[in-house]
C-alpha cells in the first residue's frame, strides 16, 4: 500500500502512525538517491515533446518552459536550467497562465 503524507510532517510522527512505513522523499529537497525521481532533477537529454531535436535537462523545465502567459510566451532558455532552482514561472511575474504550447 502507498500512502502520501505532507512533506511538512516530521518523520517521527509518520512512523508513529505507520510503524512499518518505508519513507520515500521524492521531492527536489530529498537527502538520498530518490531525489532522482523529482521532476526538477537534471537528468539531461530529455526530449521536448513535439519539438524535433530539442532536449531539456529536466521534466519541470519542459513544463515551465512551454507554459504561455498573458505577458510572456514560451521560454526555451528554461530547458537548459540544471540547477534545480529558479525553474518556476509565476503569475506574479508573467500574468495569467494561458496554457502550454504543443512544442516550440
Regions found by a protein language model. Name each.
Residues 1-104:
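Charged, low-complexity intrinsically disordered segments
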Amino acid at each position: 500500500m502507498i500512502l502520501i503524507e505532507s512533506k511538512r510532517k516530521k518523520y517521527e510522527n509518520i512512523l508513529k502512525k505507520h510503524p512499518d512505513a518505508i519513507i520515500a522523499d521524492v521531492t527536489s529537497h530529498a537527502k538520498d538517491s530518490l531525489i532522482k525521481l523529482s521532476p526538477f532533477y537534471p537528468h539531461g537529454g530529455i526530449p521536448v515533446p513535439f519539438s524535433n531535436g530539442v532536449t531539456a535537462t529536466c521534466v519541470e523545465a519542459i513544463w515551465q518552459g512551454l507554459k504561455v502567459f498573458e505577458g510572456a510566451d514560451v521560454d526555451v532558455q528554461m530547458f537548459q536550467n540544471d540547477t534545480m532552482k529558479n525553474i518556476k514561472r509565476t503569475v506574479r511575474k508573467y500574468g495569467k497562465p494561458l496554457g502550454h504550447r504543443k512544442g516550440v
